[in-house]
Amino acid sequence: MFDQTTNTEVHQLTVGKIETANGTIKPQLLRDAVKRAVTNFFAQLDGQEAQEVYEMVLSEVEAPLLDIIMQHTRGNQTRAANMLGINRGTLRKKLKKYGMN
């Protein structure tokens, strides 16, 4: 559903700001991309009722996010979990969910 775009983690990215070593990044571009993708999704429904949209959106965002972070950390789960702001056990559960373990 999304081009290159986790429950609490995504919420933090899209409505808050990301703290980096060099300062703060406001992820307006990510928010705009998600908004466009969800708008396009509903436009394509052609009057049909959508089911479980929340879970679908989260999984469509979470999977590529995890993939990119794991690449960035070269598979270091401790570093990845710290970057995401979640504990390593939660990260392992999410990686398993998406077949990335």
From Swiss-Prot:
Gene3D superfamilies the UniProt entry points to: Homeodomain-like
InterPro entries: Fis_DNA-bd (IPR005412), Homeodomain-like_sf (IPR009057), HTH_Fis (IPR002197), Trans_regulatory_Fis (IPR050207)
SUPFAM superfamilies for this protein: Homeodomain-like
Keyword Transcription applies: yes
GO MF terms held by the record: DNA-binding transcription factor activity; sequence-specific DNA binding
Keywords linked to the UniProt accession: Activator, DNA-binding, Transcription, Transcription regulation
Any Pfam family: HTH_8
DNA-binding region(s), chain positions: 77-96
Assembly, per entry: Homodimer.
Stated family: Belongs to the transcriptional regulatory Fis family.
Function: Activates ribosomal RNA transcription. Plays a direct role in upstream activation of rRNA promoters.
Name under which the protein is recorded: DNA-binding protein Fis
Record organism: Shewanella baltica (strain OS155 / ATCC BAA-1091)
Lineage: Bacteria, Pseudomonadati, Pseudomonadota, Gammaproteobacteria, Alteromonadales
